[in-house]
């Protein structure tokens, strides 16, 4: 069922500028769960990864990475508390089944990923091998 939802979201996003989603649970600094309406009275829960950003891993390779990962997660929780309606733009399927990549636009119009990058809690990422967070 999850892959059907991802296909529906990817199809819809090609014809709609933004897909509204209701934030639910924040997993880490660049991934959260959200509810998306795919039909009247039909909402699905989908994992959303912020596009074009890399944040430290929660189970990182060193204490410094884990600390920064927690800071990034806490900041994303501040930006999109449970129940916040955000807009998902540029939706694409992710390498992990059941997850999508999207630009997440906050109620004030800012891009959540860009906020984290500007606050040094994440860095730009366009695919490929990621740089480490440990010195």
Question: Can you annotate each of these PLM segments?
Answer:
Residues 2-5, 11-135:
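Small beta-barrel nucleic-acid-binding modules, primarily SNase/OB-fold domains
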